[in-house]
A protein has these predicted regions:
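N-terminal beta1-alpha1-beta2 module of alpha/beta enzyme domains
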Residues: 1-71, 178-179
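Active-site beta-loop-alpha junctions enriched in small/polar residues
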Residues: 8-10, 44, 76-78, 106-110, ...
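Short coil/turn segments at secondary-structure junctions
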Residues: 11-15, 77, 116, 120
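Alpha-helix N-cap and loop-to-helix initiation/capping positions
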Residues: 16-23, 50-54, 81, 85, ...
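Flexible domain-boundary/linker segments
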Residues: 20, 48, 56, 79, ...
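Short, flexible coil/linker segments at or flanking structured domains
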Residues: 24-27, 57-59, 68, 74, ...
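Internal, glycine-rich beta/alpha segment that forms the wall or movable "lid"
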Residues: 82-187
Length: 187
């Protein structure tokens, strides 16, 4: 049997942020020492109770101190990000962790976050997240020339490339073709 730790993480709103982050780090290091197989870290922008707005950045601080545990985003709220940037950051983290990433993505469930990022309704956020995920997978599996013309995202990478010099190639994850992906659904 494998054990995992899912933490958003939640703290009392009055707890100082540096203290909350230190406690979260301690919990994950302990989970690694106890043999937990994975840890899931949430992402929220507008709450003092769940103060991790950048889970990949937070998890990167633990790579050496928690050398065995797999790190999972629980979740990256894709409608609040540019999926090209997320694809590059995910690939970089997966490389730094030697393939210990599980990518959790979702539409965003905290209503104050949704308001901050344009107050789109859940069905539209689902469509944005799924299109963004499709785009990320395309970026991980292909090199220029690339074109995407979707409902929410429109880009090309074909005119200003120099593939023989590596210009026009996006970062690829350590795990091929890409890290395991988990989709969060909110009802």
């Amino acid at each position: 049997m494998e054990l995992g730790l899912f933490t958003q993480p939640v703290h009392r709103p009055e707890k100082p942020w540096d203290q909350a982050l230190a406690e979260d780090r301690e919990a994950i290091i302990l989970a690694d020492q106890l043999g937990f197989s994975e840890v899931w870290i949430g992402e929220h922008f507008t709450t003092k109770a769940e103060q991790i707005p950048a889970p990949l950045m937070f998890m990167a601080t633990l790579l050496k101190e928690a050398p065995s545990i797999r790190f999972a985003t629980g979740v990256i709220n894709l409608p609040y990000h540019n999926p090209v940037v997320v694809a590059a950051e995910v690939a970089q983290f997966d490389q730094l962790s030697d393939g210990r990433l599980i990518l959790g993505i979702g539409p965003g469930g905290l209503m104050s976050d949704a308001e901050l990022f344009g107050d789109k309704e859940m069905p539209e956020r689902y469509r944005i997240a799924l299109e963004g995920l499709d785009l990320m997978i395309k970026l991980w599996q292909e090199d220029a020339p690339l074109n995407h013309h979707g409902e929410f995202y429109d880009f090309s990478l074909e005119k200003r490339v120099w593939l023989s010099h590596g210009v026009g190639s996006m970062a690829k994850p350590f795990q091929q073709p890409y890290p395991p992906i988990a989709l969060a659904m909110v009802g």
